[in-house]
């Protein structure tokens, strides 16, 4: 067996006095490289081979070694050289079986502790020279205390382990004696950063220790160094069971219980780790931790990992530390860091049988010997069995005989007689089986009712979704989904930023538990879709807004139909996603309306709005305005859902948006009216229930074609005599009253509250535009329309419709509109003016790039179709009055077919083109995208519309 090892390349024979050195070199590439790099060490070993007496006393020797250095570059070089020399010596001791396994990992731990403290002390002196000395309020010097976690704290460090550290200092304060005073927190942060660099940075000399700071409070998101008070607050208020588990092995490096700071820190942490009562609640937390590791083993194919695999080191630690967490508060003999020292106490307390303790101890030593040999080969942190014959031979040689301590703490030789790698594996499997049996007896795997592939996948997501999420772990999970490799980084950064931000929020225990269950569902579902990059940021934004509102999180987690619906909405509409994120109260719609996609009837908008506002006092105007916006957003959401789910056709979508706007206009007028009447009284010419005021809608609202982002084109009219006035104590003229009413209506619409702006209102279509009065009498309006209006203003009147007013005022406006539209016009002049106006619009509005088509402004688009409809009305209404009846384009084309103005083919073709293009605009509105598409879309519709346009306007020029 031993003959398989390679001793070539060195001037050494495999016999005699050089045999131990040959064994050390053959067993470890690291030792060989260290001897090649450090000639003085090689010379020392050739004069005198390492012995047990050479081990230890690291701090004193290192102090001498560092006494001559002047800067951090030299510090880095010396630390690495010293570490490599001592590690090579311990590898020699291990390879030649000169000491017990326990001795080796105790020495590895002592070496690490000495190096860390020496580096800290040297850097502390340097930082004091640069920044001053940190002191508390009493002027007492404040030290940096370092807590060693894991195997370092338990004095069980393996050969090439990383080190888990937590930095802390006693009290806040400032530095003294430096060029510039800085806070203690800043001083210790800088010191900590320089210490990590001194240990962790890979230089030409290698590294000292891979340094992991993620076990500190808040992990990577937390401060690098915390005061005692901040640490105490964290562990009392936010400390979790896995942190208690980790703290079992915590040790203050350089521990000195005569030091008041050391005593205080230890007394502060002990109650967090060890509860005064039997803490059976820890079992489930530990079980969940183990299940998480088991899933990681499967996910990363780590079954051969001697640390994480079944029956490995981690399960042995779980068994022992579970007893420590449950019983350690009451049975203080369990409050020890070393696993091997705790085992006999578990037997004394009848928590383990002697045989169980022996099986666990033997398996632990066997695994630790195997782990150390594996890592000593190349100074690499590995726990996976090798596949090559050379390294397998090294392992078999090291593990077929080794020393361990017996029950009397005396060296005991353990021997195996393997002839093959399979025999070694059989012994390993036997140890692991012993551990596995005990683990299942004592802790076990709680029966999982639904171990379906989906639930397994959700569990894996739950494992990796934490503030310290790792990109490689995420990539391993994403490989099971139809996610492009080039998108992995985008998803990682999105998740990392989100999860880190959430970790700093006061979410509470209940909320965090719900989030931990919800997020795996979200990620599994979204990553299973093709539009994951669209949906994920939008849905995360919604969840982000409700992280501190646990009720909403529970709604998303518990109601199975809501999350898929939200994902679908987010995929189809950024507008909807942003509305829900901005106003989370819209999620109430999902609770109240189980059939959210069923919108109400048109006539119900007014009655529902009235009922919605009843609960708010009339005098609370701000609350009323807020409620109006909430009502609009809630129903806008329901309409959008119906649109996205295909419940309503495009024409009905616009109808609902139009009726919703009309209901809101009515309530806005009511609010403004009551406010004005309360201040000034009402115009005296009015009867009891009259207001003498009308709101005329133009554009898309007038044409019953409102879109999601449409503004409201409004004109205000009244029927008051000019000489009249109001009836209040502060009487004003009728004109002033209606002017103030119009201004008040405008201010309500445009007021920006926490619920957003109600509607953008455009009043430029009133007589004389911006130069005209904000509100006109019916008589003045009629005169202007029939004697002064430009052709484009009369075109706009085609889409005019009274959306608020008494029946008599609605009739009056309809009469004015009808008589105006039915005036006879010269065909040639009319077509020329409309064509010229369209040409001006095209020149000023169309800025579409090559290869694109603007659905609204480009030739063959919506504007051309609208102009065709308006042209037909203005040209033929004097002959066919029914052409003046409708304000919407579709019914205008229907009337034109019925009157014989358009053929069935042309009329239906225009309606089809109009509705299809409108539908596409709706879709783009939902995505908050401009109304621009690729010019390969709507080719036939554009050609048809352009052909009709030319027939009407070009061929007749």
UniProtKB/Swiss-Prot annotation:
- Gene Ontology biological-process entries: regulation of glutamine family amino acid metabolic process
Reactions mediated catalytically = [glutamine synthetase]-O(4)-(5'-adenylyl)-L-tyrosine + phosphate = [glutamine synthetase]-L-tyrosine + ADP; [glutamine synthetase]-L-tyrosine + ATP = [glutamine synthetase]-O(4)-(5'-adenylyl)-L-tyrosine + diphosphate
EC code(s) of this entry: 2.7.7.89, 2.7.7.42
A single GO CC term for this protein reads: cytosol
Q: Does the keyword Protein transport apply?
A: no
Q: Which Pfam families match?
A: GlnD_UR_UTase, GlnE
Keywords from UniProt, A to Z, are:
ATP-binding, Magnesium, Multifunctional enzyme, Nucleotide-binding, Nucleotidyltransferase, Transferase
The cofactors it requires, by name, are: Mg(2+)
- What general EC class does the enzyme of this chain belong to? transferase
Q: PANTHER family in the record, alphabetically?
A: BIFUNCTIONAL GLUTAMINE SYNTHETASE ADENYLYLTRANSFERASE_ADENYLYL-REMOVING ENZYME, GLUTAMINE SYNTHETASE ADENYLYLTRANSFERASE
> What function does the entry list?
Involved in the regulation of glutamine synthetase GlnA, a key enzyme in the process to assimilate ammonia. When cellular nitrogen levels are high, the C-terminal adenylyl transferase (AT) inactivates GlnA by covalent transfer of an adenylyl group from ATP to specific tyrosine residue of GlnA, thus reducing its activity. Conversely, when nitrogen levels are low, the N-terminal adenylyl removase (AR) activates GlnA by removing the adenylyl group by phosphorolysis, increasing its activity.
This protein is called what?
A: Bifunctional glutamine synthetase adenylyltransferase/adenylyl-removing enzyme
Origin species, per record, is Haemophilus ducreyi (strain 35000HP / ATCC 700724)
């Amino acid at each position: 067996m031993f003959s398989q090892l390679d001793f070539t390349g060195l001037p050494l024979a495999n016999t005699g006095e050089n045999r131990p050195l040959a064994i050390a070199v053959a067993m470890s590439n690291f030792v060989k490289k260290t001897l090649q790099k450090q000639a003085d060490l090689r010379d020392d070993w050739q004069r005198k081979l390492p012995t047990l007496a050479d081990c230890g006393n690291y701090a004193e020797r290192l102090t001498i070694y560092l006494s001559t250095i002047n800067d951090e570059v030299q510090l880095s070089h010396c630390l690495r050289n010293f570490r490599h020399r001592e590690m090579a010596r311990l590898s020699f001791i291990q390879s030649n079986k000169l000491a017990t396994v326990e001795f080796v990992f105790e020495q590895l731990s002592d070496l690490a502790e000495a190096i860390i403290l020496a580096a800290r002390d040297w850097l502390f002196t340097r930082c004091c020279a640069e920044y001053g000395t940190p002191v508390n309020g009493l002027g007492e010097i404040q030290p940096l205390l370092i807590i060693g976690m894991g195997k370092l704290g338990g004095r069980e460090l393996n050969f090439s382990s990383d080190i888990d550290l937590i930095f802390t200092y006693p009290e806040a304060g400032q530095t003294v004696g430096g060029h510039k005073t800085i806070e203690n927190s800043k001083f210790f942060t800088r010191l900590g950063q320089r210490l990590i660099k001194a240990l962790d940075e890979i230089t030409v000399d290698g590294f000292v220790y891979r340094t992991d700071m993620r076990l500190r409070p808040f992990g990577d998101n937390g401060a690098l160094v915390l005061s005692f008070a901040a640490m105490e607050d964290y562990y009392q208020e936010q400390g979790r069971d896995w942190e208690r588990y980790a703290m079992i092995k915590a040790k203050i490096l350089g521990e000195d219980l005569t030091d008041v700071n050391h005593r205080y820190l230890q007394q502060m942490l002990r109650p967090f780790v060890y509860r005064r009562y039997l803490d059976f609640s820890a079992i489930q937390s530990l079980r969940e931790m183990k299940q998480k590791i088991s899933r990681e083993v499967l996910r990363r194919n780590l079954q051969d990992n001697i640390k994480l695999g079944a029956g490995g080191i981690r399960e042995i630690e779980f068994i022992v530390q579970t007893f420590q967490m449950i019983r350690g508060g009451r049975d203080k003999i369990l409050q020890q860091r070393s696993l091997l020292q705790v085992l006999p106490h578990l037997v004394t307390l009848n928590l383990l049988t002697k045989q169980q303790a022996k099986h666990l101890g033997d398996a632990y030593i066997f695994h630790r010997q195997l782990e150390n040999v594996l890592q000593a080969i190349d100074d690499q942190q590995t726990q996976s069995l090798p596949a090559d014959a050379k390294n397998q031979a090294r392992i078999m040689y090291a593990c077929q005989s080794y020393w361990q301590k017996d029950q009397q703490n005396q060296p005991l030789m353990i021997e195996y007689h393997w002839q093959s790698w399979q025999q070694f594996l059989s012994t390993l499997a036997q140890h692991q089986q012993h551990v596995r049996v005990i683990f299942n007896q004592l802790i076990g795997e709680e029966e999982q009712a639904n171990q379906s592939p989906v639930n397994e996948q959700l569990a894996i997501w739950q494992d990796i979704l934490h503030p310290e999420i790792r990109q490689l772990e995420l990539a391993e999970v994403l490989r099971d989904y139809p996610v492009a490799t080039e998108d992995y980084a985008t998803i990682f950064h999105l998740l990392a930023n989100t999860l880190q931000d959430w970790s700093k929020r006061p979410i509470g225990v209940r909320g965090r538990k719900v989030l931990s269950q919800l997020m795996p569902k979200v990620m599994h579902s979204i990553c299973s879709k093709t539009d994951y990059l669209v949906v994920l940021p939008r849905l995360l934004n919604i969840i982000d807004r409700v992280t501190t509102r646990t009720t909403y999180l529970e709604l998303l987690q518990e109601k199975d139909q809501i999350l898929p619906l939200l994902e679908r909405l987010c995929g189809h509409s950024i507008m909807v996603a942003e509305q829900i994120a901005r106003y989370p109260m819209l999620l109430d719609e999902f609770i109240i309306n189980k059939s959210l996609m069923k919108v109400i009837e048109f006539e119900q908008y007014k009655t529902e709005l009235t009922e919605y506002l009843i609960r708010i006092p009339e005098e609370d105007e701000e609350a009323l305005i807020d409620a109006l916006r909430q009502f609009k957003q809630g129903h806008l959401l329901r309409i959008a859902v119906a649109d996205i789910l295909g419940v309503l056709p495009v024409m009905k979508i616009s109808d609902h948006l139009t009726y919703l706007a009309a209901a809101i206009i009515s309530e806005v007028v009511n609010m403004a009216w009551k406010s004005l009447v309360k201040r000034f009284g009402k115009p005296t010419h009015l009867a009891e229930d009259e207001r003498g005021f009308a709101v005329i809608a133009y554009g898309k609202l007038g044409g019953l074609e409102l879109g999601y982002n449409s503004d409201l084109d409004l004109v205000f009219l009244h029927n008051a005599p000019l000489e009249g006035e109001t009836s209040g104590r502060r009487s004003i003229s009728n004109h002033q009253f209606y002017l103030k009413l119009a201004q008040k209506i405008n201010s309500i619409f445009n007021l920006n509250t926490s619920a957003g702006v109600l509607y953008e209102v455009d009043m430029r279509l009133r007589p004389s535009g911006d130069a005209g009065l904000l509100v006109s009498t019916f008589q003045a309006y009629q005169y202007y329309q029939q004697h002064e209006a430009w052709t484009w203003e009369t075109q706009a009147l085609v889409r005019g419709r009274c959306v608020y007013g008494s029946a008599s005022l609605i009739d009056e406006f309809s009469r004015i509109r009808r008589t105006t539209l039915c005036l006879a016009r010269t065909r040639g002049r009319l077509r020329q003016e409309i064509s010229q106006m369209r040409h001006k619009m095209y020149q000023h509005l169309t800025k579409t790039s090559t290869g694109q088509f603007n659905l609204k402004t480009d030739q063959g688009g919506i504007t051309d179709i609208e102009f065709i409809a308006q042209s037909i009305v203005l040209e033929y209404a004097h002959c066919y009055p029914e052409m003046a009846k409708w304000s919407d384009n579709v019914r205008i084309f229907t009337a034109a077919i019925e009157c014989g103005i358009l053929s069935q083919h042309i009329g239906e073709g225009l309606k089809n083109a109009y509705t299809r293009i409108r539908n596409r605009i709706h879709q783009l509105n939902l995505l908050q995208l401009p109304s621009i598409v690729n010019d390969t879309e709507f080719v036939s519709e554009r050609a048809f519309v352009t052909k009709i346009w030319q027939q009407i306007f070009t061929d007749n020029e």
